[in-house]
Curated annotation (Swiss-Prot):
Name of the protein in question: Coiled-coil domain-containing protein 18
Record has Coiled coil as a keyword: yes
Annotated gene: Ccdc18
Gene Ontology cellular component terms for the protein in this record: centriolar satellite; cytoplasm
Stretches with biased composition (Basic and acidic residues): 806-840
Localization in the cell: Cytoplasm, Cytoskeleton, Microtubule organizing center, Centrosome, Centriolar satellite
Length: 1455
């Protein structure tokens, strides 16, 4: 049996040694691979600079590719996955992605800081990874040393066994030691396998980190491109800002010029008012003069009345004479009609005779033409005779040839052809003669028609002539036709003598007829001459009569000339007055031209403003597009964040599944432990049976000593072989140590290179900080410029207010002047009514005179008609009469025009009355609005005072709350306090930004209202100026008309004098009222100035309160510094926190009441409402801080890193928002200046502004209600989160207690086992090992902190998505998971209490040490160096925690 057991032991030892050698070889190979990869990574990181990232990304090295290929082999990767590393990688990826999205959103210089921070974080991650690898290497070295130590122990044990084999009783002890050695070897195998798994995992991590490095480099390239684009955009924005500032300066200059122009216009208006006053004084003087003239005219009227009576008498006598003259005229007219008839007859006869003479002359010309034609016909006849002679000769020759019979036919044909030719020639001649005769007949017929129309006697003569002519023509035609016929029938028989005799006879008959006609015409002419002499005698008689009548006409004309002279005098006076009117019209036209030029300039300025508004709109549209892009990117980031959140949830689920698997594994290990215990019990029973067998076998042992000696020799041989193998392993281990030393030297060199790179990057960070300081300085300068611009705007507003006051004064003066004008118009109406009555009477008289003149005119027209027809000498008289008639027509037209003017003036007066009524109504409405506004101002002042009191009370309450918060903040550490300070500063910035936005909106609304008011006022001023000019025109026309009417009218002047005196009295009273009104307006202006001064004082007080708040915040910072020293008093302050919470609740109830009051105040004033909303938000935030501070005392260290990242992101966002708001503010300032230039075109829009204010108040109410709802929802979410945090804290505390107890149990078990199985000399090692492990156990408690930190980070990550919709579901899931954990932990605690109780204070011993270490260091988050120090601290803690986890896992494997 012993031999078999020894063989079995030798075989097992051989197998174990072979497995150990194989494991060592694989470990060496993997260590070489990892060291080679680390060496390559170090060289690449040292060689690659930030500018060469793109080249590295584009061309990776061959060594890196080989390492990746070697590391990605399936033999090295294996099946294992390291879940915590996955978690870390995913969280880092998610944070990197979030940072990417944020970098894409931000368009400011903070992106450089983000890049530096990202690079720093990546470097820290690489360092962590390198540190993990180094720690793994160290752990492997320690394990190898422990294996070597165990081998030495085994050698010692073997020696002990050799010494013990001499004694037969020590064999079971050796067997037990062999069993222990086998267990230790199996544990070492497990450790080596775990080391292999870790190496594989480290290789995977290296691969993943290489991928992450490549991605980081690509991201750096992308970020550089983005930075270039952002820098370009920033330059463009700066250019646009500079252009906008330049435009603003130009607009301010234009605005100043416009102010000067408006001031000049106002001066001109004042000058015109003075001129009008002077004109009124001149009018009064003129009225006095006119009264004097009226007195003179009265005297003249009396004289004229007497003359008028005389003229009436003369008129009556003249009427009688006129009647006589009319009788004579009627007789003369009858004679004239008779003479006209005679003259018409004579003229007709003369015309007829003249026509007869003309016809005779035409006949003579026709005879001459006929003679010429006859001569031509004679010549043709001679030619015909020659032809006949020739034909005769030919006939003779033909007669000779008749004898020849065969030629008869030819002769006959020839004759026929000749006859035809002759006939054709004769027919042509006849046609020509017939055409001439026809033309003569037509002329004669026309003459007949004319003569038959005019006179019967001449018709007879014409009839005789035509009969003679026709008879002659017929005879001629018949003769010619007879001749032709005879020629045709008998051409051969005619001779030359006969033709000549015929022609002579024809000529003689024609001459006789012409002589007869001449005699007849001569007799007719003599008769006509006799008639002409008779007519001339009659004309001479008529001339004598006409001379008598012309003398009578001359007398009448002289009378008319006298009347015309009087009329010309009147016309001269009218022309003088018309000239005056023209001068006044010219002046009015000049003023109208001036006003039109001013209006044109205004229109040009308006067009320029419109163009600039269009530019601003285009810029606003560009800004809106960019804002939409940013919103779109922000929405994308939100979506990505939600996706990441979902991925994190999935990861959490995976981790939960892994935890469940781990729990299952733990349970399985417990089962295995129970099985092992059972095996131990079985082995103990077996040992007892072996003892029995040993007692029985002692007898047999003596027999088998020889066999054992042989077995001992075999064992010695085996031991010698094992010693050889151990020596080989020692040599291999020494080689490994040398290689590890080389690799460690290389790692140190890499560390030095990393430190150099860090120094360089720290220098770059320092440069960036300087640039940031410069930019902040520039921003401060821009803010100062904005403040200066605001000051200038306030000054311009004051100037505008003064101008509005002046405009109000001018309007009041205009209203008073209009009242005076209305009174004067009433007086003029009365005068017009009286004058219209007199005019009607005069017009009736005038109409009677016009009728008489019309009758005379008709008679004169008849006389002139007869005179024109009678002689040419009367034409002069006719022209004179026509001139007189034209003058009378002009007089009529003038009368009609005057009547039309009077009607137009009546219409204008009606229009002016309606306009004056409208103006009076508008003035009344304005006065009412003024009273209403004054009452509203008083009410607002009272409300302001009440609100200021409430603000002071609120400030006092806030001070008390601040003191309480100081006591609460004493609990927290410096890092969290600094973060909260930043958070509060950010919220203050947001509140200030909101206040700025509200103030800008208020200013915009005020500007819009003032613009509208100024536009309406300018429009009304223009209308009123037009009305004034129109009134000036009407007044001047009235003056002209009144002057004309004063000449005609008599009794109205006395009444007008009395009315003018009354008007003067009224004017004096109105002047006194004007002075009183001016004094009242001055008093009102003084009151308004006082109110403005009070408002400025209130603003200063508000600024002082803000400064005090800042000072209080600085005091809070100092007290927060003092908090770090008083951290040990946290436990005592727990009760005080509860009291403060109750006080905060009371203050919260008081603040709710204050909010209600603020809501009421917001309905009245929007500015104070914004301030009160800010106070509410601050109070709410501080309450939330108090609750969080009370609830998050135990989790302060865990949330620091996450809050820093969060606050930095928020600071970047807010800084970008601040930049965007500054740009928007600059744009709004530009638009404000442009709108300020438009201010002077608006007036009286208070009704619309009141409606707008009411609508805005309703909107503000709705927004406040929505904000209150959101605040209540946020409170609920915070409470839910606080519950989740409390549950997590409790669960973590329970886990930490469990872990410490389990560690104590394990340490106790190890101590007991070491004391059992090892002898006295080897107990020192077992004592040394727990001593070395005891700090690990103490540090193992930090593993729980690390886990707790992870949990808190997950919670804070969920806090980042504070506005996500899935928060409620997450909180519910977390609560359920924590409840499960609590249930499991309570069961574990109960089992732990049964096994080994341990105090709670021992588990928390390492915590205060770490806290003191953390608190001893100063965390300056205001600078990048302080933040980097803090990050390095956390990295070290993470390294320590990872080392502790590794040691804990190794100890668990050993157990």
């Amino acid at each position: 049996m012993e031999f078999i057991s020894s063989d079995y032991c030798t075989k097992d030892n051989d197998n174990e040694e072979e497995s150990l050698l194989a494991n060592v070889a694989s470990l060496r190979h993997e260590l070489k691979i990892t060291e080679w990869s680390l060496h390559n990574l170090g060289e690449e990181l040292s060689s690659v600079s930030p500018s060469e990232n793109s080249e590295y990304v584009c061309s990776p090295s061959r060594s890196e590719r080989l390492i990746l290929e070697e590391l990605t082999q399936p033999s090295h990767l294996g099946r294992l996955i390291y879940p915590p590393y996955k978690k870390v990688c995913k969280t880092s990826d998610s944070t990197d992605y979030q940072k990417k999205s944020r970098d894409q959103v931000s368009f400011s210089s903070v992106s450089m800081d983000q890049e530096v921070k990202n690079l720093r974080e990546k470097l820290h991650k690489l360092r962590q990874q390198n540190a993990c690898l180094v720690t793994q290497n160290h752990s492997l070295m320690t394990k190898i040393e422990s294996v070597h130590f165990e081998l030495t122990q085994s050698k010692a044990k073997i020696a002990m066994l050799e010494s013990a084999q001499e004694q037969a009783a020590n064999i079971p002890i050796l067997e037990e030691q062999i069993i222990n050695l086998e267990a230790e070897v199996s544990a070492q195998d497990k450790v080596l396998r775990e080391a292999e798994d870790k190496l594989e995992q480290s290789q995977k991590m290296v691969i993943e980190k290489e991928h992450s490095l490549q991605e980081a480099k690509e991201e750096c390239i992308k970020l550089k491109v983005d930075l270039l684009e952002q820098s370009k955009q920033g330059k463009r924005a700066e250019r646009q800002r500079n252009e906008a500032l330049y435009n603003a300066e130009e607009l301010s200059k234009a605005f100043q010029l416009y102010k000067e122009k408006v001031a000049e216009k106002l001066e001109k208006v004042q000058d015109e008012e003075e001129i009008l006053e002077r004109n009124l004084s001149n009018c009064e003087k003129e009225n006095k003069r006119l009264q004097e003239k009226c007195n003179l005219y009265k005297s003249e009227l009396e004289i004229l009345k007497e003359k008028f009576r005389e003229l009436k008498e003369e008129h009556y006598s003249g009427k009688e004479k006129l009647m006589i003259m009319a009788m004579k005229n009627s007789e003369v007219m009858s004679q004239l009609t008779e003479s006209r008839q005679c003259i018409l007859k004579l003229e007709r006869e003369l015309e007829d005779k003249d026509e007869i003479v003309r016809e005779k002359f035409s006949l003579l010309n026709e005879n001459r033409e006929l003679k010429v034609r006859v001569a031509t016909q004679n010549e043709r006849l001679e030619l015909c005779q020659q032809d006949i002679d020739n034909s005769r000769v030919e006939l003779k020759s033909l007669e000779k040839l008749i004898t020849q019979i065969p030629l008869k036919r030819e002769i006959v044909g020839f004759r026929s052809s000749l006859c035809k030719h002759q006939r054709s020639s004769v027919s042509d001649k006849e046609d020509k003669c017939i055409g001439c005769c026809e033309a003569n007949k037509l002329m004669i017929s026309e003459l007949r028609i004319k003569l038959a129309i005019r006179e019967a006697e001449i018709q007879k003569l014409h009839a005789n002539l035509t009969v003679n002519q026709l008879s002659q023509n017929v005879a001629n035609d018949s003769q010619e036709c007879g001749k032709v016929n005879t020629l045709e029938t008998e051409p051969v028989k005619l001779g030359g003598s006969q033709v000549e005799s015929i022609k002579d006879g024809d000529q003689q008959t024609v001459n006789k007829q012409y002589e007869r006609e001449k005699q007849r015409l001569a007799t007719g002419i003599e008769e006509l001459r006799a008639k002409l002499t008779q007519i001339e005698a009659e004309n001479s008689d008529l001339k004598v009569n006409m001379a008598h009548r012309t003398s009578q006409f001359q007398l009448i004309q002289e009378e008319l000339l006298e009347k015309a002279s009087n009329a010309s005098k009147l016309e001269n006076e009218m022309t003088k007055k018309c000239s005056q009117l023209l001068i006044l019209e010219k002046q009015l036209e000049e003023k109208i031209i001036a006003y039109s030029s001013i209006a044109a300039k205004n229109a040009e300025l308006e067009q320029e403003l419109m163009e600039k508004n269009e530019k601003i709109r285009s810029l606003e549209s560009n800004i809106n597009t960019e804002h939409e892009k940013i919103c779109f990117a922000f929405e994308k980031a939100k979506k990505i964040h939600l996706e990441q959140h979902k991925e994190m949830e999935k990861q959490i689920e995976q981790l939960e599944t892994q935890l469940e698997k781990r729990d299952q594994q733990f349970k399985e290990q417990e089962k295995t432990m129970s099985i092992l215990q059972q095996d131990i019990l079985c082995k103990q029973h077996h040992l007892e049976s072996l003892d029995r067998l040993l007692t029985e076998s002692k007898v047999e042992m003596e027999k088998e000593n020889m066999k054992k000696d042989e077995a001992l020799k075999a064992l010695q041989i085996h031991v010698s072989e094992e010693t050889i193998k151990v020596r080989q392993l020692d040599s291999a281990l020494e080689i490994c140590k040398e290689e590890l030393a080389l690799h460690l030297n290389q790692l140190e060199r890499n560390k030095e290179k990393f430190e150099r790179q860090l120094k360089k990057k720290s220098e770059e960070v320092y440069c960036l900080q300087k640039e940031l300081k410069i930019k902040t300085h520039n921003l401060e300068e821009t803010s100062e410029q904005n403040a200066i611009l605001q000051h200038t705007l306030q000054q311009q507003q004051q100037m505008l207010q003064q101008e509005t006051m002046r405009n109000g004064e001018l309007e009041d003066t205009q209203s008073k002047l209009e009242k005076q004008v209305s009174k004067q118009e009433q007086e003029l109406q009365k005068q017009r009514e009286s004058s219209t009555e007199k005019l009607r009477k005069m017009e009736e008289k005038y109409e009677t005179a016009i009728r008489e003149v019309d009758l005379k005119r008709q008679k004169i027209i008849e006389l002139t008609g007869t005179a024109r027809q009678a002689k040419l000498e009367m034409d002069q008289y006719k022209e004179e009469l026509s001139k007189m008639e034209k003058e009378i027509i002009h007089l009529k037209r003038d009368g009609e025009n005057k009547s039309m003017q009077l009607s137009q003036l009546d219409m204008v007066l009606d229009q002016t009355k309606t306009e004056l009524e409208k103006t009076t109504n508008s003035v009344k409405e304005l006065e009412r609005l003024q009273h209403h506004t004054e009452t509203e101002l008083t009410e607002t002042m009272q409300k302001r005072e009440a609100l200021e009191n409430e603000l002071q009370n609120a400030h006092g309450e806030l001070k008390s709350t601040l003191r309480q918060l100081q006591e609460l903040r004493d609990v927290l550490q410096k890092a969290q306090l600094s973060l909260e300070e930043k958070y509060t500063t950010i919220k203050d910035l947001t509140a200030e930004l909101r206040e700025c936005k509200m103030e800008i909106e208020d200013k915009k609304q005020e500007l819009i209202e003032m613009d509208q008011a100024l536009k309406e006022r300018n429009w009304e001023l223009k209308q009123r100026a037009a009305q004034v000019t129109h009134l000036d025109m009407t007044i001047r026309e009235h003056r002209g008309e009144m002057e004309q009417k004063i000449i005609k009218l008599e009794g109205t002047l006395e009444k007008s004098e009395l009315e003018l005196k009354e008007c003067n009295k009224q004017v004096e009273s109105l002047n006194e009222k004007l002075q009183n009104a001016k004094e009242q307006l001055r008093e009102k202006e003084f009151i308004m100035l006082q109110n403005e001064q009070e408002i400025s004082q209130l603003k200063k007080e508000i600024e002082r309160t803000q400064q005090r708040m800042k000072e209080m915040e600085s005091v809070i910072k100092e007290q927060e510094d003092y908090i770090a020293t008083q951290y040990k008093e946290v436990i005592d302050l727990g009760q005080e926190l509860r009291l403060t919470q109750e006080q905060m609740q009371n203050t919260h109830s008081e603040l709710v009441e204050a909010r209600r009051q603020e809501v009421q105040a917001q309905r009245e004033i929007e500015r104070l409402a914004g301030e009160l909303e800010d106070i509410k938000q601050l109070s709410k935030e501080k309450e939330a801080h108090g609750n969080r501070l009370a609830e998050e005392l135990g989790a302060s260290q865990v949330r620091e890193a996450h809050l820093e990242a969060r606050m930095q992101a928020e600071i970047k966002k807010l800084s970008s928002e601040v930049d965007s708001l500054k740009e928007a503010y600059q744009i709004e300032m530009i638009s404000h200046q442009e709108n300020h230039a438009k201010w002077k075109l608006s007036a009286e829009s208070q009704k619309t502004s009141v409606q707008q204010l009411n609508e805005q108040l309703e909107k503000a109410k709705q927004e406040l209600e929505e904000a209150q709802d959101t605040v209540s929802n946020l409170h609920q979410q915070v409470q839910d989160r606080n519950e989740v945090i409390e549950a997590a804290n409790e669960a973590l505390l329970i886990k930490e207690s469990e872990l410490t107890r389990l560690q104590a149990k394990i340490s106790g078990h190890e101590k007991t086992e070491d004391t059992k199985y090892l002898p006295a000399p080897f107990t020192t090692l077992t004592e040394i090992i727990p001593d070395s492990q005891h700090p690990n156990f103490a540090k193992h408690s930090q593993i729980s902190l690390f886990k707790c930190r992870k949990l808190r980070r997950s919670i804070s990550a969920s806090d980042l998505s504070f506005k996500s919709h899935g928060n409620d579901d997450l909180s519910e899931e977390l609560l359920q998971d924590l409840k499960k954990m609590q249930f499991e932990q309570t069961s574990a605690i109960e089992s732990g209490h049964k096994d080994l109780p341990l105090t709670h204070s021992e588990s928390f011993k390492p915590l205060p040490y770490n806290l003191e270490d953390d608190s001893s260091e100063s965390n300056d988050f205001s600078t990048l160096s302080g933040m980097l120090r803090y990050i390095n601290k956390e990295v070290r803690l993470l390294k320590k925690s990872s080392l502790q986890t590794a040691t804990g896992l190794s100890q668990g494997g050993k157990l």
